[in-house]
Amino acid sequence: MDAIVKNFPVLDDTSGRPTQKEAEEAVRVLLRWAGEDPAREGLKDTPARVAKAYREIFGGYDLAAEDVLGRTFEEVSGYDDIVLEKDIPFYSHCEHHMVPIIGKAHIAYLPNGRVLGLSKIARVVDIYARRLQTQEAMTAQIARAIDETLVPRGVAVMIEAEHLCMAMRGIKKQGATTMTTTFTGEFKSEPAEQVRFMTMLRGFK
């Protein structure tokens, strides 16, 4: 898993990030390249809008999963079985063509003395989704963040998504779904735990 996981640093003011003005000018260049006139009425404000939208869409680069996962809770009444959150919706962008990836994540872990607030898992998905991604890398990144921060007995992550780079261009196969999984700890070493994870997913349909 280490080979695929990318460690994105939290950016600061010294990172060399272009300014808002430079980002807007880059959009104007793309508009001209596409054959458009960025000065026409309908496009005059587009560069600023695109730069603002991209700041939000790619806001995950400014966030660290470890900060979100830093606060945990003692297990309630000694609960130590699977904790599963399924159907967590997300959108991301393909790092190859910068077009959307739309999907949902299913995440489970086996507690080892501590549990996460339920919203924290969804926030971690959001952090990694709001970056340029491959689905394989995102799956591994989520699993690693939870595994290293919470140190549970095991983590299971499944992502299913439609890649618009495959639907809008190239082979143009709309509706095709890609599924990826990553398992750590007991989910990786104990096939029965993987079966339980998959059974719980199917049972909640």
Swiss-Prot record:
One of the GO BP terms on file: tetrahydrofolate biosynthetic process
Segment forming the signal sequence: none
Stretches that traverse the bilayer: none
Catalytic activity: GTP + H2O = 7,8-dihydroneopterin 3'-triphosphate + formate + H(+)
InterPro entries: GTP-CH-I_C/QueF, GTP-CH-I_N, GTP_CycHdrlase_I, GTP_CycHdrlase_I_CS, GTP_CycHdrlase_I_dom
Pathway this chain belongs to: Cofactor biosynthesis; 7,8-dihydroneopterin triphosphate biosynthesis; 7,8-dihydroneopterin triphosphate from GTP: step 1/1
One of the Pfam families matching this protein, by short name: GTP_cyclohydroI
Enzymatic class: hydrolase
EC numbers for this chain: 3.5.4.16
GO-annotated molecular function: GTP binding; GTP cyclohydrolase I activity; zinc ion binding
Keywords carried by this UniProt record: GTP-binding, Hydrolase, Metal-binding, Nucleotide-binding, One-carbon metabolism, Zinc
GO cellular component, as recorded: cytoplasm
Residues reported in the UniProt entry to bind Zn(2+): C94, H97, C165
Family classification: Belongs to the GTP cyclohydrolase I family.
Record's subunit section: Toroid-shaped homodecamer, composed of two pentamers of five dimers.
UniProt xrefs under HAMAP family: FolE
NCBIfam families in UniProt: folE (TIGR00063), PRK09347.1-2 (NF006825), PRK09347.1-3 (NF006826)
Name the record gives this protein: GTP cyclohydrolase 1
Species, as recorded: Sinorhizobium medicae (strain WSM419)
Lineage, highest ranks first: Bacteria, Pseudomonadati, Pseudomonadota, Alphaproteobacteria, Hyphomicrobiales
